[in-house]
Amino acid sequence: MSKVYDWFEERLEIQAIADDITSKYVPPHVNIFYCLGGITLTCFLVQVATGFAMTFYYRPTVTEAFASVQYIMTEANFGWLIRSVHRWSASMMVLMMILHVFRVYLTGGFKKPRELTWVTGVVLAVLTASFGVTGYSLPWDQVGYWAVKIVTGVPDAIPVIGSPLVELLRGSASVGQSTLTRFYSLHTFVLPLLTAVFMLMHFLMIRKQGISGPL
């Protein structure tokens, strides 16, 4: 085993990377409230795992979506547990994200030179809210349907570009299969990819600049 490790160490300098990760200076003022961002990340990873598991059973069609969710909850092995964890982890992610934003704002973590870290955090907050909007509609029950209809109808109040925006969101003039397909694609592919990219940027900047000092 040591020979295998030495082979990789010679080429990749694994020990140097490990030392850099584990030896980062942590300011003495850091407390449990500085863990809120990490908890948000953990919730996101739980969302990815449980969401991926549900894609094996969920059917993104207006005629089968609700029945497939019922199947997950009543027939699939541990489906009720996976969906419940997904749901509660989603709520926890939103709550931890809000508390994290408040902590950063109240401790001045958005000030120079960490403006870009704050910007990426704001983008992540918008993406988190978008997860909630798109995921809420996927069961395609009465609550999900009318939520989509209301949310996608909001841009209609914007002059000139309002109607085209509504049609872009819905995929057609009215809420239907095209809308569900778009929301499913956003929820399972586009938003997770964007979130992963911005999280990586966010953490790299934190890694480079370190944790902000006390006020």
From Swiss-Prot:
Topology in the lipid bilayer: Multi-pass membrane protein
One BP annotation, GO: photosynthesis
Pfam families documented for this protein: Cytochrome_B
Binding-site residues for heme c, renumbered to this chain: C35
Alphabetically ordered keywords of this record: Chloroplast, Electron transport, Heme, Iron, Membrane, Metal-binding, Photosynthesis, Plastid, Thylakoid, Transmembrane, Transmembrane helix, Transport
InterPro entries given in the database record: Cyt_b/b6_N (IPR005797), Cyt_B6_PetB (IPR023530), Cytb/b6-like_sf (IPR027387), Cytochrome_b_N_euk/bac (IPR048259), Di-haem_cyt_TM (IPR016174)
Binding site for heme b 2: H86, H187
Predominant place of localization: plastid
Family: Belongs to the cytochrome b family. PetB subfamily.
Assembly and oligomerization: The 4 large subunits of the cytochrome b6-f complex are cytochrome b6, subunit IV (17 kDa polypeptide, PetD), cytochrome f and the Rieske protein, while the 4 small subunits are PetG, PetL, PetM and PetN. The complex functions as a dimer.
Function: Component of the cytochrome b6-f complex, which mediates electron transfer between photosystem II (PSII) and photosystem I (PSI), cyclic electron flow around PSI, and state transitions.
Extra remark beyond the main annotation: Heme 1 (or BH or b566) is high-potential and absorbs at about 566 nm, and heme 2 (or BL or b562) is low-potential and absorbs at about 562 nm.
Protein name (record): Cytochrome b6
Organism field: Nicotiana tabacum (Common tobacco)
